Amino acid sequence: RYPGTAVARFLARYTAKLAPTALHFEAARKLGFFDVSPRWKDFSYELCLDATMAMSTAEGYYPAWDGMLMKRFDSFIPDKIPVTIIFGDTDRTLPATTCQERSVAPNHAKWIIFPNTGHAPMWDSPLDVIDEIKKTVALAS
């Protein structure tokens, strides 16, 4: 039942008061972000603190997770609605072997795997994510 990020949620929730000081140290950033990203060392203090505080106060975290369990593309999505699915090649939260099922996505979906990118592509590959969003929006116009 627990998501792959349950440990991160637990750590964030119970260390939130320490985070503003602790995240100045590489060991604390590694503890919180090593499993999320291969580029965790490049993350700014602000990104780590914002993510930690958001995770620690997200009361809807488990209800949202529960709501997504076993949810798939379960109804027809017309070809005129562009669908882009982005994963990182080192995503340990939703690994390719168990969670990236192309067969359940619409046939017309564009499937992208960013290299050297973890569970949060917007952190690891922000410019690439922006580019793909722009391309997808252009298709919808």
Language-model features: locations:
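Alpha/beta-hydrolase-fold serine-hydrolase catalytic core, especially in secreted/extracellular enzymes
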Residues: 141
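Hydrophobic "lid"/C-terminal helical patch
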Residues: 129, 133, 137
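Flexible "cap/lid" loop of the alpha/beta hydrolase fold
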Residues: 1-17
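Conserved alpha/beta-hydrolase catalytic His-Asp/Glu region
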Residues: 20-77
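Short glycine-/acidic-enriched loop or helix-start segments at secondary-structure transitions
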Residues: 1, 95-97, 123
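Conserved serine/cysteine hydrolase catalytic core
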Residues: 57-104
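Catalytic histidine-centered segment of alpha/beta-hydrolase-like enzymes
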Residues: 93, 114-130
